[in-house]
Amino acid sequence: MRIGIKKKPVGRIIYELTAVFALDSAGGGMVVNSLIALWLAQRFDFTLGRIGLVLGLMSLASAASALLSPMLSARFGMVETMALTHAPANVLLIAAAFAPNPQLAVLCLAGRSLLSQLDVPPRVAFVMSLVQPEERSATAAFTNLPRSIATASTPWLGGWLLTKSSFGWPLVIGGSLKLVYDAMLWIRFRKFSTRA
């Protein structure tokens, strides 16, 4: 691996993780806040004020997860925390698309926000645990660049889908991609998991 990872098996694991992380990010690009705002306006006729309130609630729920993540990682392991908290978040994201009323949709989105970021601290810690200290900066850059590109590559599709229908197709497709990420992460990487 050219980023400076000395152990070849670890280099391969980093490549695989990077690809799996990019899949998750592609799903995330389908449900950026601007597209969720557009969907809420189209589907439930939310005003800008209500949309702002919902997005604020989602952000607060997401911030709360930062406090829970280290405790879960220490108890269950990093990969377990990543996959097993992220999967229910994505089920809630998909469920929001099918919500028959705005209250249930907002409840699903808030629940999703509470769970969806629990994977971030253990993801970073897990990747860093695989490499030598002097390799961490390069590894972080290597794993984050494809994630950023993947996130940037899918909002257009979410927007296009919303021009065709007020149904939450971006939520369903984005959530489904993220569920595939969760399954791949669990199947392929749980044997490497450690407690943080």
Task: Outline where the language-model segments fall.
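Juxtamembrane intracellular "pre-TM" segments in multi-pass secondary transporters
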Residues: 1-25, 42
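Short amphipathic helix-loop junctions that connect adjacent transmembrane helices
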Residues: 34-51
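Transmembrane alpha-helix termini and helix-breaking/packing motifs in multi-pass membrane transporters
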Residues: 38, 42-43, 153-172
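Loop-to-transmembrane helix entry/capping segments in MFS-fold secondary transporters
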Residues: 48-49, 133-143
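Helix-to-loop junctions at the C-terminal end of transmembrane segments
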Residues: 65-78, 162-163
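Structural signature of the two symmetry-related core transmembrane helices
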Residues: 80-95, 175
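Helix-loop junctions at membrane interfaces in 12-TM secondary transporters
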Residues: 97-109
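Intracellular juxtamembrane helix-capping segments at the cytosolic ends
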Residues: 118-131
